[in-house]
Amino acid sequence: MREYRIKDTLILACDHGYGNIKSCHSVFKASAEVSETAPIFSKDYVKFKDKYYVIGEGHKSFLADKIADDDYYILTLVAIAKELALRGLKEAKIHLAVGLPLKWVKTQRDSFKAYLLRNRYVNFEYREKEYLVEIAGCTEIGRAHV
């Protein structure tokens, strides 16, 4: 597996689409449904700050501003966990490379970056495995559909 690093920092790409979240090695539905209790039937969930988020089972309504709720933050954690799991890691220092639609790069770049960097150290569970991640930085890249 090819990896990109800046010194000891792993660079992870994540495209925050309205229908799907895409990383280098995974694609999943952009859906996170919050609950105060652990889900009974699904193992595809994130536990973060005493809340549970079931991933990929519903459909997220369109929001032009992706920072209007916590969903894209949680979905980013899922993308991180999936990439780390492929590498056999549970802890990592990472730099996010994220895609935003060209139409919104200029107006949302700074706010989306702050949204993703709001917690430098993030401790969460995904699929009943604990992860500890240091999000050292974030680069926003405009994306276009061909």
What are the residue ranges of the model-derived segments?
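Nucleotide/phosphate-binding catalytic cleft detector across ATP-hydrolyzing
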Residues: 1-143
